[in-house]
Amino acid sequence: MAASRKSRILIADDNATNVELLEVYLAGLDCETAVAVDGRDTLDKVASFKPDLILLDIMMPKLSGFEVCKQLKGDPATRGIMILMVTALNELGDIERAVNAGTDDFLSKPVNKLELLKRVEIMLRLRHVEDEVERLRRYIEGMEDSTGPGA
């Protein structure tokens, strides 16, 4: 069995104050964090950092959070990454658009620290359960291959 690694959280926000606040809030968690400052940077960091969760702002330069989310959720290699949109937008239409883009959850700014941390914990737990289910699925498929006809 592979050794477990720390959870990885990517903070994607073009506002340095928001990034600093989120980093302070996440400091008590046993996780690694990285920062992306715009939509394209977010996609680049996803490829190199391989996050379990992205805290994604919607209103960013180059690509909006909606566009980033839609691209990530549309790609089989990245669709399993949990996305929590953390944004100043809070109208029902914004939430609907975020859900349609594929977000897993939505949190309006200003964020409450406890609410953010609980949502992050739940989403990371869910991500790890999904990873374990996938690992077991591959294991079972391997067992079936070795016990099938001609084995």
Regions found by a protein language model. Give the residues of each.
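Active-site beta3 strand of CheY-like receiver
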Residues: F49-L55
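Receiver (REC) domain active-site loop signature in two-component systems and cognate sites
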Residues: M60, I83
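Non-catalytic signal-transmission and effector/linker regions of two-component phosphorelay proteins
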Residues: M1-L10, E23, R127, D131, ...
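C-terminal output helix
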Residues: V111-L124
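Two-component/phosphorelay signaling modules centered on CheY-like receiver
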Residues: R8, A16-V37
